[in-house]
Amino acid sequence: MNTFQMRDKLKERLSHLDVDFKFNREEETLRIYRTDNNKGITIKLNAIVAKYEDKKEKIVDEIVYYVDEAIAQMADKTLESISSSQIMPVIRATSFDKKTKQGVPFIYDEHTAETAVYYAVDLGKSYRLIDESMLEDLKLTEQQIREMSLFNVRKLSNSYTTDEVKGNTFYFINSNDGYDASRILNTAFLNEIEAQCQGEMLVAVPHQDVLIIADIRNKTGYDVMAHLTMEFFTKGLVPITSLSFGYKQGHLEPIFILGKNNKQKRDPNVIQRLEANRRKFNKDK
């Protein structure tokens, strides 16, 4: 399977939609947009092809479902009936777009040197990121959106599964409600887990649909955490960061874990980017 074959497969699977397609050969992306208002999404074909080797048709089904829901929610409609309980925070990488395709700034806040908090209107099976043009229709200020979203994310259930590896405990929050990574904003929940930890607490949001918390008690734990975050990061539909965060008393600090077999392979580009982001974040605070 190559990008051209994947392009054709997706176009065939999405032929029931009233959309147009625009293929960018150089960037290996496919933009899918509505014919009535030109709103749409852009997907990276090379990333899907890479996942296809492992997940086969399942990844295609996931993309088709995602596009179906996104295109449906991009229809022009009123936002006046939206309730406060539908305002939610979503976590994105700091490299995520700051504006819509039409050039309208999104409502977002810095979170860490690696992550940013965007805000969204929950629409059931999908959500729509809030931009400045929507504030008037929502009849909300940016501050009200922040407060509502944090209140709502704290109301989400925080069920998790655990796994123990060589004395280290790993917690996985994976409810697939679109806000698993957003639970990193629930300080009360993180503090609850921190109280149970016997070693160093690490937190990771490799992609939108998972939050990993680890109680690291030995060197093996760090290696496992590094492997987990990279594994989830490469397989997520909305990847965020492959780095973990140290957590202590409400404070998150991005860290770069060196695997035991890679001590001489410390990527200077990764370190340089992390340090640059960290300096910029601290300067702007």
Curated annotation (Swiss-Prot):
Q: Which domain of life is it from?
A: Bacteria
The parts of the chain that form a coiled coil are none
**InterPro entries with a match to the protein in the record:** DUF1444
Family in the record: Belongs to the UPF0354 family.
Q: What is this protein called?
A: UPF0354 protein MW1686
